[in-house]
Regions:
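Generic alpha-helical structural context detector
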Residues: 13, 48-49, 72
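Histidine- and aromatic-rich ligand-binding microenvironments
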Residues: 7, 105-106, 127, 142
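Short acidic-hydrophobic, aromatic-tinged amphipathic segments that line or gate anion-handling sites
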Residues: 82-84, 139-142
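Active-site neighborhoods of divalent-metal-dependent phosphate/nucleic-acid chemistry enzymes
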Residues: 76-124
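Short, well-structured N-terminal submotif of metal-dependent ribonuclease cores
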Residues: 1-39, 54-66
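A generic "structured core" feature
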Residues: 36, 92-94, 137-138
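Short loop/helix-cap segments at secondary-structure boundaries that form the rim of catalytic
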Residues: 130-136
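Short, conserved alpha-helical segments within structured domains
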Residues: 42-46, 108
Length: 142
């Protein structure tokens, strides 16, 4: 049984019906086994931060209290759990960023790739950029 580590955009798509990828995210999510999907501190914080950002969420923006409620609803689903950082994550993250050129996504994408690889999870994203990292086999939702 695979454990999946969705990026922030997948979590937003799952939680908000108005998200352009909501249907795709829900169809994927409905195939998961219990404890088959993990939040990490980075995706938790990003989900909360972006849920409350009017520039990102437009008419779907929520209050901080509502963001916590949405997070708790996701976490309360038997398919979802919170994963602590695995041992060895920082070394893997450093290795994945040491020789890369700058991009505004390098730090976060490399962190999620390193987290999934170190924990034995599968990255999940709508972003094909995750396929650029060697030794990973991300699930790109379309």
């Amino acid at each position: 049984m695979s454990v999946h580590l969705p990026d922030i955009n997948v979590w937003l798509a799952l939680a908000f019906e108005g998200h352009e990828h909501h249907r795709t995210a829900v169809e994927w999510f409905d195939t998961l086994n219990p404890r088959g999907c993990a939040f990490c501190r980075f995706t938790q914080q990003g989900f909360l931060r972006l849920s409350t950002n009017p520039a990102v969420m437009k008419g779907d923006v929520v209050t901080m209290a509502e963001a916590w409620k949405n997070y708790d609803a996701l976490l309360g689903d038997g398919r979802v759990f919170f994963s602590q950082e695995p041992d060895g994550l920082e070394q893997n993250w450093r290795r994945r960023t040491r020789d890369r050129g700058y991009s505004h996504r390098t730090w976060s994408d490399a962190y999620l790739v390193a987290f999934a690889e170190t924990a034995g999870f599968v990255n999940v994203s709508f972003d094909r950029g995750f396929t650029a990292y060697d030794a990973t086999n991300p699930l790109v939702l379309e």
